[in-house]
Amino acid sequence: LHEAFVLKRQGVELGNNEMEDHIKVTIFDTEKELLRAVFDRMLDYPFIITFNGDNFDMPYLYYRAQRPEVGISKEEIPIVMQRDAATLKHGVHIDLYRTFSNRSMQIYAFGHKYSEFTLNAVSEALINESKIEFDGGIGDLPLYQLARYCHNDSRLTFELTHFSDDLLMKLLVVVSRVGRMPIDDVS
């Protein structure tokens, strides 16, 4: 949870390291090294929790890894792409975007505290925290600021599963058990 991986790119500055001491930033020279490290880290956890990971993060990682200049084979990628979701070969992927955009969760579980289904809107409404704002494009950020931005998004995503005595995870487990469905199908 307290790591950030970034890719060194020509013409992009390092910037100032304003990360808290307990956060480790690893800067990779090649995209292949970065992706291999991400995939290795994914194997360390039984659950991978994302916010809109089905539509962005997982497909991005999956297809970038297979680009000829990167050259990671499909067999080495721990992600399995399905028609409308991403699953894992070893573990469970929970996409919180799908969970929080479920009207029953939005209205009954969380009292309609949020009306937009973005990480920022849900985080502000439920945990009173927000994404880091910046000017310009994300690709223009110096590497340490990019690491800080990405780590904050990951932290917010985790906190959404952890607040109120792990309320969301408990709800997902109960619905999964009652519906006799895998937790990644429920989410």
Please identify what each model-predicted range represents:
Residues 2-10, 14-18, 40, 47-143, ...:
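Metal-dependent phosphoesterase core characteristic of DEDDh/y 3'-5' exonuclease domains
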